[in-house]
Amino acid sequence: MSEKTLTRMDLSEAVFREVGLSRNESAQLVETVLQHMSDALVRGETVKISSFGTFSVRDKTSRMGRNPKTGEEVPISPRRVLSFRPSHLMKDRVAERNAK
């Protein structure tokens, strides 16, 4: 497994090389796309990117949890969590890479 992490800079550099926009325009494009995705998720909307996956926000109810050190029961408050569900194509690509 690779230790490499894909960053915003990597994405904007790829747009610069492959699309032909200037470096500034490429960085601005990446930032704009990420901002639109973030804004939609904050509003509770689902972000679906075909052949990639779906980002969604789920509401979790309050429940009782347990402190692993003491075993004491502690209440866990309700919260919103972000989840990602990869598309079947993405799952297949990752599995194919693992098979090599």
From Swiss-Prot:
This protein is one of the two subunits of integration host factor, a specific DNA-binding protein that functions in genetic recombination as well as in transcriptional and translational control. Involved in hydrogenase gene expression. NCBIfam families: himA, PRK00285.1. The keyword Transcription regulation applies. Keywords: DNA recombination, DNA-binding, Transcription, Transcription regulation, Translation regulation. The gene is ihfA. GO terms for molecular function: DNA binding; structural constituent of chromatin. Heterodimer of an alpha and a beta chain. GO terms for cellular component: cytosol. Pfam families: Bac_DNA_binding. SUPFAM superfamilies: IHF-like DNA-binding proteins. GO terms for biological process: DNA recombination; positive regulation of metabolic process; regulation of DNA-templated transcription; regulation of translation. It comes from Rhodobacter capsulatus. PANTHER family: DNA-BINDING PROTEIN HU, INTEGRATION HOST FACTOR SUBUNIT ALPHA. The keyword Transcription regulation applies. This is Integration host factor subunit alpha. Belongs to the bacterial histone-like protein family.
